[in-house]
């Protein structure tokens, strides 16, 4: 006899699991969420590092959780989640030669609605900045921004906010090509090839490649899905603003947990799941590592890696060999570091003389070496070489929220990509960590001369090793598996599982290994709920609310 019983059991308390748990509980189902770690949230994790008084996000940082329907359906702003939108420019690019762009958002995001006024005056201002180093690229960006707003946006949003169509039906990328709304060759191009096809200036080529890498975590010589190509092109001149969660991204998890609890759901931490209990080809519950058994009267939902679902929870013996093979062949190529610096003062960027306000929430500092970035970054990583150039993807938390550092002090986070763990091993990351941080500080001074070691109080380096251990990942990839074209849409993670249901018809997967992939947006959980609503006849709140998605 089971120790506890729920209609729906959720394995893993990451933000996707909390999203889907809240929706299921809203439908009157009894819901239990079981989390291995000491707190729920998964990648929505904030810790006091590197010293008492400083906090840092150890996973998700650059967030747009306001795009998540769960943010509105559960009124998370009433549950402790405050999103901060820095004034002025939300996104900036600083190059070693002194050129820069500080781009304002193209939409005015409002807290309590998904209808955000368009800001054409910001587009005009952003275009002028591009024109300072390429009139042709400025015209191209203007055309792309308008094409995205008028045509592509509807398709991109529909793709993100819905499960992929069943196999055999056309996906939206195919429909776009059929209707001659995009260049068909973009489908097979890698990121670098698109950059060189669309733009002429080294600045815009480099920016596009780094923006794509920041969005989905792949190298310039890897191909991304067409819908993500369109999203990246449409974001070049500002797009939606970037936000930070006041006090840390873990407050997203706190708000979702409150939503779950208010709907009547339960959650348990330090409750590692050993396996899914099966009977007559269906899931009937789970067994915890301590031997406790939990009944699942209707379904089990996994907010975990597909490797765990197949290799551990369901078990290879209970899985068709072809599915086992496909899951084992999934690839996750990109590794990296996320280094949090405690600082005496904020970086003083020399570009501020010509671009006031270029210190932004999301910022790219780049050496203006697009050919190296396109061809050599991944090649050097695969050889186990420490990256020659630091392509800074950084934020300056304390400039916009004083909760992140003691009074009068500051902090910044730097993201840098590196080789995959399967190529070099954890020992390599440990060995080169200090050298990597020294290279960051050295090259930071190309852009901000005050960023010497005298300005650094201390740092905390979080690499793929820590991420892999924290979230039980194959190689510490923040998107779980690569978001390359072969592992997206109807192919993510494998065709048989692409609509969130496994070969066990009441076992579902809702983690970032599913469509639309990694990021703190809650859409994997939301779309998994859509599939479950279809299977079980549950509430379709998007229809009741009059939302398109």
List where the protein language model places each region:
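Extreme N-terminal leader/targeting segments of oxidoreductases
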Residues: 1-8, 26-27, 488-489, 540-549
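N-terminal glycine-rich phosphate/pyrophosphate-binding loop and immediately adjacent elements
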Residues: 2-157
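Helix-rich C-terminal "cap"/substrate-channel and partner-interaction subdomain
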Residues: 138-170, 394-490
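Active-site/ligand-binding neighborhood in enzyme catalytic cores
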Residues: 149-263, 270, 471-487
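A glycine-rich dinucleotide-binding beta-alpha-beta segment and adjacent secondary-structure elements
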Residues: 201, 205-218, 386-395, 449-515
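Mid-domain catalytic core of redox enzymes
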Residues: 245, 274-405
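Beta-rich nucleic-acid/ligand-interaction surfaces
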Residues: 266-267, 271-284, 458-473
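A conserved FAD-binding loop/helix module that cradles the flavin
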Residues: 510-533
């Amino acid at each position: 006899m089971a120790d506890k019983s729920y209609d729906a059991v959720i394995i893993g308390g990451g933000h996707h699991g909390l999203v889907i748990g809240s929706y299921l509980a809203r439908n009157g189902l009894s819901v239990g969420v079981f989390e291995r770690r000491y707190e729920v949230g998964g990648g929505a994790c904030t810790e006091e590092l590197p010293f008492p008084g400083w906090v840092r996000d150890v996973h998700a940082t650059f967030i747009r959780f306001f795009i998540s329907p769960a943010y509105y359906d559960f009124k998370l702003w009433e549950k402790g989640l405050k999103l901060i939108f820095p004034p002025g420019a939300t996104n900036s690019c600083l190059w070693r030669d002194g050129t820069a762009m500080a781009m304002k958002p193209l939409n005015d995001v409002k807290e309590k609605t998904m209808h955000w006024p368009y800001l054409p005056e910001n587009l005009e201002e952003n275009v002028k900045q591009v024109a300072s180093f390429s009139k042709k690229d400025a015209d191209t960006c203007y055309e792309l921004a308008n094409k995205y707003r008028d045509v592509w946006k509807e398709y991109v949003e529909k793709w993100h906010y819905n499960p992929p169509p069943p196999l055999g039906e056309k996906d939206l990328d195919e429909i776009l090509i059929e209707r001659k709304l995009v260049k068909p060759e973009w489908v097979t191009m890698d990121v670098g090839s698109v950059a060189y096809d669309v733009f002429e200036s080294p600045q815009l080529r480099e920016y596009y490649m780094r923006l794509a890498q920041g969005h989905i975590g792949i190298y310039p010589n890897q191909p991304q899905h067409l819908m993500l190509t369109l999203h990246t092109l449409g974001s070049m001149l500002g797009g939606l603003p970037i936000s930070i969660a006041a006090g840390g991204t873990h407050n997203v998890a706190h708000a979702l947990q409150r939503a779950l609890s208010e709907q009547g759901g339960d959650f348990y931490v330090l409750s590692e799941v050993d396996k899914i209990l099966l009977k007559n080809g269906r899931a009937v519950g789970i067994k915890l590592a301590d031997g406790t058994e939990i009944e699942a009267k209707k379904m089990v939902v996994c907010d975990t890696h597909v490797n765990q679902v197949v290799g551990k929870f369901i078990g290879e013996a209970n899985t068709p060999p072809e599915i086992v093979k496909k899951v084992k062949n999934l690839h996750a190529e990109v590794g990296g570091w996320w280094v949090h610096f405690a600082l005496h003062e904020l970086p003083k960027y020399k570009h501020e003389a010509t671009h006031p306000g270029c210190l932004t929430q999301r910022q790219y500092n780049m050496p203006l070496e697009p050919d190296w970035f396109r061809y050599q970054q991944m090649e050097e990583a695969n050889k186990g070489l420490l990256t020659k150039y630091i392509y800074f993807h950084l934020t300056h938390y304390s400039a916009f929220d004083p909760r992140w550092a003691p009074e009068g002090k500051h902090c910044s986070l730097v993201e840098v990509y590196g080789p995959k763990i399967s190529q070099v091993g954890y020992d390599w990351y440990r060995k080169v960590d200090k050298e990597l941080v020294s290279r960051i500080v050295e090259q930071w001074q190309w852009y901000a001369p005050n960023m010497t070691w005298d300005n650094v109080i201390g740092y905390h380096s979080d690499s793929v090793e820590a991420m892999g251990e924290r979230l039980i990942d194959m190689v510490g990839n923040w998107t779980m598996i690569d978001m390359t074209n072969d592992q997206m849409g109807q192919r993510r993670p494998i065709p048989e599982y692409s609509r969130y249901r496994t070969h066990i018809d009441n076992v579902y997967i809702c983690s970032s290994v599913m469509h639309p992939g990694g990021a703190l947006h809650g859409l994997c959980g939301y779309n998994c709920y859509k599939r479950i609503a279809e299977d079980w006849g549950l509430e379709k709140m998007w229809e009741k609310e009059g939302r398109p998605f």
